[in-house]
Curated annotation (Swiss-Prot):
InterPro entries, A to Z: Membr_insert_YidC (IPR019998), Membr_insert_YidC_N (IPR028053), YidC/ALB3/OXA1/COX18 (IPR001708), YidC/Oxa/ALB_C (IPR028055), YidC_ALB_C (IPR047196), YidC_periplasmic_sf (IPR038221)
Entry GO CC: plasma membrane
Primary localisation category: membrane
Alphabetical keyword list: Cell inner membrane, Cell membrane, Chaperone, Membrane, Protein transport, Transmembrane, Transmembrane helix, Transport
Name of the gene this protein is made from: yidC
Species this protein is from: Burkholderia multivorans (strain ATCC 17616 / 249)
Name of the featured protein: Membrane protein insertase YidC
Amino acid sequence: MDIKRTVLWVIFFMSAVMLYDNWQRSHGRPSMFFPSATQTAPAAAGGASGAGATTTAGNVPAPAAGTAPATTAPAAQAQLVKFSTDVYDGEIDTRGGTLAKLTLKKQGDGKQPDLYITLFDHTAGHTYLARTGLLGGDFPNHNDVYTQVNAGPTSLSGDQNTLKLSFESPVKGGVKVVKTYTFTRGSYVIGVDTKIDNVGTTPVTPTLYMELVRDNTAVETPMFSHTFLGPAVYTDAKHFQKINFSDLDKNKADYVTSADNGWVAMVQHYFASAWIPQHGVKRDIYAEKIDPSLYRVGVKQPVAAIAPGQSADVQARLFAGPEEERMLEGIAPGLELVKDYGWVTIIAKPLFWLLEKIHSYVGNWGWAIVLLTLLIKAVFFPLSAASYKSMARMKEITPRMQALRERFKNDPQKMNAALMELYKTEKVNPFGGCLPVVIQIPVFISLYWVLLASVEMRGAPWILWIHDLSQRDPYFILPVLMAVSMYVQTSLNPTPPDPVQAKMMKFMPIAFSVMFFFFPAGLVLYYVVNNVLSIAQQYYITRKLGGVKKKPA
């Protein structure tokens, strides 16, 4: 019995450690075992992007946002144009017509102002913005000061469905650019139309770049729960490719650099932004470090030659919002993958679908978690029953095992041989309870990541003191209940004969509960319910087996 329990705990603990370390490395953070393997290397500002990125930004202007290039004429004064819709409050910087600030209004309910997330921002402590410009000549780019065209209302009124804001560049290289943002009611997708006018006397062949620029500062990441932060690229050829900041630091980023489909994105916990060019239009993809702590990912889209007096229109979409899976699926192919489940995606996606269906009936994410956990335990009941039956059989022969250990304590070889003979005679497999548990581990790990990655948990209440399932329990009631449930579950099993193992089993509930004090309440709720159901199952099966044993007598 003690051998099996030791193996189970070793498997569980090592799985948890390896999972955490793998997640650390895949998200660009130092490994617990080989820190140098993912150590962030210093890089000069404006460094090239790296392997697989030979067509990167190279000639894209790279001064920090808001810094104008030196000119012989006096620099124009940039302004911030504020706007508001039903989902956004934001600011457009007339320097470059850059979307410099974007607050997601629908992420708060007015009662919890801290839930209002500012996605794009450009302050002394944080930079994250979306910008565009032209390459291929001395054409307007994100450093030039634009002027607002037909300045009118900058708020979406009650009877409006769309809000359009247009900005016109100065003439440079015989080219003038008019950039128009279209905001639609209820939508996190922004239309970005770039009209390129050739007001010169010779044909021009510009290239339009669209990029996302941000620092590597994490936002809203729960303690002990690191999620991916950084650029991502999606194409039909390679599908979803995450790019770690650490790989950009070391010029080792590997991703598709040319396509006529897909999108580029910046991903963080719960939220993302993505440039989505028109499908079927050739574009080059780039990602690079442009400052000690500033990175960018973008596309360069060539524009056909424009004759004097003619113009060209380039349309694209900019997504900036929460990682709501169903919404993302309807915006662009593969965009739902920014909600990152890692290597357990194949299991996690169906679990979230089921959780979402349950929520559609009960209307509360906390109760949806409880019911989903109950459903999973019911599905795995046959496996759990097999495990508990094996444990019960081992419990029956534990006194005889202890007697053999005492008898052959000075001869380990004979003791092992005697134990093997006992197992054979009683038809007991000491590892019989392990397999059912191991099979369930991927499912429970997947549910963990579903609850951690789902923005739907953000601000979602359960009952009484739990007002936000994405935050830790403010009074630590759930972690304490989890510690108690773990202790009860441990006490239902026979005490290992080895004193060291016995102490370890008593220590585990305390160790886990301390860690879970800082976990989101939704995750702890799942573990508490899972433990309570496991205790009930084990008690039921053990009692049933005991009743069966007594009947013949």
